[in-house]
């Protein structure tokens, strides 16, 4: 819906309630779409569907009394929309495990409804997904015994099998720890030690194809590697019978799964700014974020989702897997977001209506396809990194597809704010999801913006850290400091200024490295850029811009900055060209590696200027300026 549609739907009842000084009683009717008389044509239609009625406390709509005419009507419609979105969140049952929610979705949308597939083209129905998860989980539990470790790491070859493994562990109270195999052997061993993980589920074929033998060898020294090829042989008739029974009678699992407040999964921070930490998320965290997103984003069982993001990333796990599965949307998972042409073709083949990805990957998908391959999309959702205007323009002009930018963190499961079809504003990450409490804390030295601190049902249970393995470190009072500097306008739209850690202090002035990257994106919109702050003997720090722009010249960028009136401290002192900007498995820029590249390039340049001989030179970097 557009903003006009929002007023058309909510404007009149909101205005009537306001003029009558009446309170609004939010009522949510859930299940009516499954009746024989429904026009929705959703799967799971039956003669006598279960109808749930949920009522929230009555509330009065308040707006600025100075508003008149259309402005007041729009504000009232928006206020009523906010009330109803919160009512939708409150009506969703978050007091259960994720697997219980999957069983409920199976009952609601039908056992034979196809819901999940991947690049292997072997679709799973709800019934087969439940059967496979319960059979595998029963076999794993039987093999480990009741006293087995609660946390099991997962590093599986295909998204579909990984999804089954996640639900298998959750179904029997185990906690899947999602290992990012691109982290490197040492980081993976540290991740396992953090959560006291003793068993890692993986695959010999996956290890061989991805050439991960060093990773497997390192993990094998500290954990037990359980290969799925062997585990499948251990799934016996009793396990399959139990899975079949639950797939037909989901209530057999009632009371057997973990409590809502217990850990549902462990994910790891990207390490884009330092050592990764283990983020412990509860079942209630996942279900709350699913409900928060579903309350504001129109996602229906008639949609089709393509998710190329890895599920060891919180965006890929919550938004790309749990959300569509639990609201009845058929989902296709793809194992690598880097296969641009293949993902674009998959969207066309599946006639997908929703695509989840990051800005970097969306740019690749937008440039790769033939004419019309992305035409089926209703919208694409971008997260994990800022969306460039060039990407937004590419999707709007070439495909007519709106690009909805969101924002969050692994610690918030992950979504905190998102632009939606009804509420969107370019240059922002949208408005906070219902249920989010935000505190804006001033930070010394920052002229614009404040640090965002949040609390809500989707905020993590706590961290695992390398220094104290297995010890949970909860956020004080439930408040999580995001480390992001933001501004929030009068309409509630959030704009990210930068990160506290991603500022350089130059002569006492705080310079946003994100601002430097944004300026570079304006000058060279078709390339990727990363800015880092390095020590400077005179001014404390200096900014170095690392770019994939071939032939990038420092003087050229300085001229551009002067023409645009960009403040002098924000102009990088050196421009470093690299063939490819290093990224993590999530698609985020790998800033520690970028920083090391910049340090090495500056050190080599300084040595050459000093007249030293035999100074090694990096093959793929060219430094200009400095």
Q: What spans do the regions from the language model cover?
A:
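Structural core segment of the AMP-binding/adenylate-forming
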Residues: 171-241, 358, 549-553
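AMP-binding/adenylate-forming catalytic core of the ANL superfamily
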Residues: 200-202, 456, 461-462, 485-570
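Conserved C-terminal "lid"/linker of ANL adenylate-forming enzymes
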Residues: 228-229, 504, 532-535, 544-548, ...
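Conserved AMP-binding/adenylation subdomain of ANL enzymes
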Residues: 287-304, 312-353, 368
């Amino acid at each position: 819906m557009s903003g006009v549609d929002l007023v058309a739907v909510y404007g009149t009842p909101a205005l009537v309630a306001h003029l009558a000084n009446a309170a609004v009683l939010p009522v949510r009717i859930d299940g009516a779409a499954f009746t024989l008389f429904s026009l929705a044509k959703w799967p799971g239609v039956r003669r006598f569907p279960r109808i749930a009625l949920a009522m929230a406390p009555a509330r009065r709509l308040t707006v600025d009394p100075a508003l008149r005419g259309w402005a007041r009507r729009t504000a009232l419609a928006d206020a009523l929309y906010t009330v109803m979105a919160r009512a939708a969140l409150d009506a969703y049952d978050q007091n259960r495990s994720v697997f219980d929610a999957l069983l409920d979705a199976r009952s609601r949308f039908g056992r034979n409804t196809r819901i999940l597939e991947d690049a292997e083209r072997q679709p799973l129905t709800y019934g087969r997904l439940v059967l496979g998860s319960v059979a595998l989980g029963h076999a794993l539990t039987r093999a480990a015994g009741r006293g087995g470790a609660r946390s099991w790491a997962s590093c599986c070859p295909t998204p579909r099998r990984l999804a089954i493994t996640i639900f298998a562990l959750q179904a029997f109270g185990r906690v899947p720890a999602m290992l990012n195999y691109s982290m490197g052997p040492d980081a993976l061993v540290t991740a396992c030690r953090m959560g006291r993980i003793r068993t890692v589920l993986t695959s010999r074929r996956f290890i061989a194809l991805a050439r991960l033998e060093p990773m497997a060898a390192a993990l094998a020294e500290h954990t037990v590697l359980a290969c799925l090829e062997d585990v499948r042989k251990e799934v016996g008739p009793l396990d399959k019978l139990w899975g079949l029974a639950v797939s037909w009678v989901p209530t057999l699992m009632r009371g057997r799964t973990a409590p809502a407040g217990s850990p549902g999964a462990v994910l790891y921070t990207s390490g884009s700014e330092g050592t990764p930490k283990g983020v412990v998320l509860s079942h209630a965290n996942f279900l709350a974020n699913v409900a928060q997103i579903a309350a504001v984003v129109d996602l229906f069982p008639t949609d089709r989702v393509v998710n190329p993001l890895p599920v060891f990333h919180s965006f890929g796990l919550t938004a790309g897997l749990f959300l569509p599965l639990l609201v009845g949307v058929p989902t296709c998972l793809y194992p690598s977001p880097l296969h641009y042409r293949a993902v674009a073709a998959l969207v066309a083949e599946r006639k997908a209506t929703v695509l989840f990805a990051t800005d970097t990957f969306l740019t690749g998908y937008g440039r790769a396809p033939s004419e019309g391959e992305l035409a089926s999309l209703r919208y694409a959702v971008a997260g994990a990194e800022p969306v460039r205007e060039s990407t937004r323009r590419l999707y709007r002009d070439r495909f007519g597809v709106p690009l909805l930018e969101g924002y969050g963190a692994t610690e918030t499961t992950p979504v905190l704010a998102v632009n939606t079809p009804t509420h969107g504003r370019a240059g922002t990450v949208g408005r906070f999801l219902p249920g989010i409490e935000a505190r804006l804390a001033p930070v010394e030295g920052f002229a614009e913006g404040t640090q965002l601190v949040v609390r809500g049902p989707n905020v993590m249970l706590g961290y695992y850290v390398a220094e104290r393995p297995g010890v949970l470190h909860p956020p004080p009072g439930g408040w999580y400091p995001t480390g992001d500097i933001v501004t929030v306008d009068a309409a509630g739209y959030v704009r990210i200024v930068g990160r506290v850690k991603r500022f350089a202090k130059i002569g006492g002035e705080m310079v946003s490295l994100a601002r430097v990257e944004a300026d570079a994106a304006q000058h060279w919109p078709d390339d990727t850029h990363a800015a880092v702050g390095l020590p400077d003997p005179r001014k404390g720090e200096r900014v170095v811009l690392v770019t994939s722009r071939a032939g990038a010249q420092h003087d050229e960028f300085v001229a551009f900055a002067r023409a645009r009136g960009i403040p002098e401290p924000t102009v990088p002192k050196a421009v470093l060209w690299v063939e490819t900007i290093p990224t993590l498995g999530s698609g985020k820029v790998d800033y520690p590696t970028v920083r090391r590249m910049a340090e090495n390039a500056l050190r080599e340049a300084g040595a050459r200027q000093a007249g030293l001989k035999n100074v090694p030179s990096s093959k793929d970097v060219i430094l200009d300026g400095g």
